[in-house]
């Protein structure tokens, strides 16, 4: 197989993308990806193993290279064969479809109770909206009264306890906490 655009160049120095571009240009029509690979393999005289090793990188290059365009069904062509207007029209058509979809009113989402209990009231949902009632206050007042009763009972027990050797004086030495806090800082 001869590719006239590549005559005079060393075959070993050519990339698969260059050969694919020249091949499509010479044929003047779109080609299946598998046909392009076979033609490149024949032209570059590569073995099946070499082609298999480089086919994934070639496919990536042909997709990212701006000079090729996929036509669907694994058929490829040169982008220069197609007028820019044709490509833009396809994009505009897609934009119009998206615009039509946006014009439809969006459905309102309904809140769904994941637990399936419709009548259960969650007190956290109503936090801050509920006024304090006498029942709420009575619990707090009752707890305070119980605390006062406990303190009074404790004081009464202390008064009943007889202290041994009350006459002896006990010396209690108080230490400065400031000195201790300086000693504990190791920074």
Swiss-Prot record:
In the record, biological process GO terms are: DNA-templated transcription; regulation of DNA-templated transcription
From the UniProt entry, list the residue stretches annotated as the region Disordered.
Answer: 96-187
Regions of compositional bias (Acidic residues) in chain numbering: 117-149, 157-187
What is one term from the GO cellular component aspect held by the record? DNA-directed RNA polymerase complex
Q: Which residues form the HTH HARE-type domain?
A: 14-81
A molecular function annotated in GO for this UniProt entry is: DNA-directed RNA polymerase activity
The intrachain disulfides are none
Could you list this entry's UniProt keywords, alphabetically sorted: DNA-directed RNA polymerase, Nucleotidyltransferase, Transcription, Transferase
User: Would you say which domain of life the source belongs to?
Assistant: Bacteria
**Pfam families attached here?**
HARE-HTH
Output the Gene3D superfamilies linked to this UniProt entry: RNA polymerase, subunit delta, N-terminal domain
- Tell me, in a sentence or two, what this protein's role is: Participates in both the initiation and recycling phases of transcription. In the presence of the delta subunit, RNAP displays an increased specificity of transcription, a decreased affinity for nucleic acids, and an increased efficiency of RNA synthesis because of enhanced recycling.
Q: Which NCBIfam families does the UniProt entry name for this protein?
A: RNAP_delt_lowGC
| HAMAP family named among the record's database cross-references | RNApol_bact_RpoE (MF_00357)
Entry similarity comment: Belongs to the RpoE family.
The record describes its quaternary structure and partners as: RNAP is composed of a core of 2 alpha, a beta and a beta' subunits. The core is associated with a delta subunit and one of several sigma factors.
The protein's name is: Probable DNA-directed RNA polymerase subunit delta
Per UniProt, what is the name of the gene that codes for the protein in this document?
A: rpoE
